[in-house]
């Protein structure tokens, strides 16, 4: 997080009206795998107990993910490693968010009146796909239910991608670390080098490339 609060960020829950999408991302920090964003519009019977995905147990998160996708409108945007290395991780995250909102709007047959985004930045002016009114909320995944739901869907979606990828590259420990730079992952990078799913624009991966 930057040291200053940008003009497009607030620190409290807004009084949004009309059709409101919540948006959050998963996977900005890992050394491998895509960045994933989800957009969610809550249904009338949305699941109770929504919270920041990082505060939930894996079991509870999986149950909520299934319930959200059954009772709410949702869309997912996935930006792969090649685009991350081309755009940088911020640009890739903004693109994933844009794709998620675009996908959900297409499902619903109409645009949202407002998009609430976890964090301190919106894709407005940062991604050419973005065309919706948006508000960034610092800590929004813990205070705005639609964002909480999006954080859960994004996290579970990305975890499934990395669990599948771990079958092809078991040495890197992706079943447990999901691509983050744990000691096991860094040691595997040193021994085996980067895979096609590694982010070569990230320093620990780039350093291993230099020595191979």
UniProtKB/Swiss-Prot annotation:
A divalent metal cation binds at residues 24-25, 118. SUPFAM superfamilies: Ribonuclease H-like. One of its GO terms (molecular function) is RNA-DNA hybrid ribonuclease activity. It holds the Pfam family RNase_HII. Its cofactor is Mn(2+); Mg(2+). It is an enzyme of class 3 (hydrolase). InterPro entries: RNase_HII (IPR022898), RNase_HII/HIII (IPR001352), RNase_HII/HIII_dom (IPR024567), RNaseH-like_sf (IPR012337), RNaseH_sf (IPR036397). GO terms for biological process: DNA replication, removal of RNA primer; mismatch repair. Keywords: Cytoplasm, Endonuclease, Hydrolase, Manganese, Metal-binding, Nuclease. Residues 18-212 form the RNase H type-2 domain. It is found in: Cytoplasm. Endonuclease that specifically degrades the RNA of RNA-DNA hybrids. Belongs to the RNase HII family. This is Ribonuclease HII. It comes from Erythrobacter litoralis (strain HTCC2594). The lineage of its organism: Bacteria, Pseudomonadati, Pseudomonadota, Alphaproteobacteria, Sphingomonadales.
């Amino acid at each position: 997080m930057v040291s200053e609060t940008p003009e497009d960020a607030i620190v409290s829950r807004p009084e949004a009206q009309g059709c409101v999408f919540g948006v959050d991302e998963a996977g900005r920090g890992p050394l491998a795998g895509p960045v994933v964003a989800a957009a969610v519009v809550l249904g009338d019977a949305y699941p109770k107990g929504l919270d920041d995905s990082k505060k939930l147990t894996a079991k509870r998160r999986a149950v909520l993910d299934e319930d959200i996708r059954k009772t709410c409108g949702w869309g997912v945007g996935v930006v792969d490693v090649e685009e991350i290395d081309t755009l940088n991780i911020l640009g890739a995250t903004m693109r994933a968010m844009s794709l998620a909102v675009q996908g959900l709007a297409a499902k619903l047959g109409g645009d949202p009146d407002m998009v609430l985004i976890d964090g301190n930045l919106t894709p407005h002016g940062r991604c050419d796909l973005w065309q919706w009114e948006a508000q960034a909320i610092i800590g929004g995944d813990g205070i705005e239910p639609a964002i909480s739901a999006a954080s859960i869907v994004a996290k579970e979606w990305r975890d499934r991608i990395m669990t599948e990828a771990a079958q092809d590259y078991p040495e890197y420990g992706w079943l447990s670390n999901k691509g983050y730079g744990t000691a096991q992952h860094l040691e595997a990078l040193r021994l085996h080098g980067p895979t096609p799913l590694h982010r070569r624009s990230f320093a620990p991966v780039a350093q291993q490339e230099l020595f191979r």
